[in-house]
């Protein structure tokens, strides 16, 4: 089984660098279990199914990209990251270029009014450059994240030895992940609400 999954630009870069092998997604379905172990047992027995799949299933990444509106390719193709040009014999002006990792090139294109942004939700399957295989799935409270899992989420210490997230340093990995989580989910599912989340571990595979 193959399903799409959306990642932000920073998380795409973390996957491409090999630093991110895990993601947390809010459990949308209400869970009516009196104890935390009861929920884990129900997931293990398949009574509660993860909408992203089970170990062995594959995910293709949807990310923000740009579409060319018209540009003269002089001196050969743009030296871009993770992009092999148009697919399915497309006109290059209809090609989609991933934004993460190509910011400098896209800035030049934007200055020339040569491209428009396409939100990640609209990225078609053929344009995806990242394929993942699910290796493990479990459910837990958001605030139960461990230091090692925060690192698996793509957070790592900087040169000063402190964890880095959202452009600043934090005292520990959990605080860094809290900042990252709220930068994306604070409106609907803030850290303080401690929602149930799917913990999905994955490995990157070749298309």
Where do the language-model regions lie?
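Secondary-structure transition motif
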Residues: 1-207
């Amino acid at each position: 089984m193959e399903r799409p999954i959306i990642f932000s630009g920073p998380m795409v870069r973390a996957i491409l660098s090999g630093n991110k092998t895990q993601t947390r997604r809010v459990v949308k379905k209400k869970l009516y279990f009196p104890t935390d172990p009861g929920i884990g047992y129900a997931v293990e027995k398949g009574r509660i199914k993860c909408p992203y799949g089970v170990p062995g299933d594959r995910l293709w990444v949807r990310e923000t990209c740009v579409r060319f509106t018209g540009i003269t390719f002089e001196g050969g193709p743009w030296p871009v990251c993770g992009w092999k040009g148009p697919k399915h014999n497309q006109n290059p002006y209809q090609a989609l270029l991933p934004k993460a990792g190509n910011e400098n090139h896209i800035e030049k294109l934007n200055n020339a009014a040569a491209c428009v942004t396409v939100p990640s939700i609209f990225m078609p399957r053929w344009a995806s450059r990242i394929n993942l295989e699910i290796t493990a799935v479990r459910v837990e409270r958001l605030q139960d994240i461990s230091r090692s899992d925060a690192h698996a989420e793509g957070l790592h210490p900087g040169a000063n030895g402190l964890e880095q997230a959202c452009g600043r340093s934090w005292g520990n990995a959990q605080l860094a992940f809290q900042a990252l989580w709220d930068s994306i989910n604070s409106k609907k599912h803030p850290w303080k609400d401690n929602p149930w989340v799917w913990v999905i571990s994955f490995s990157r595979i070749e298309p």
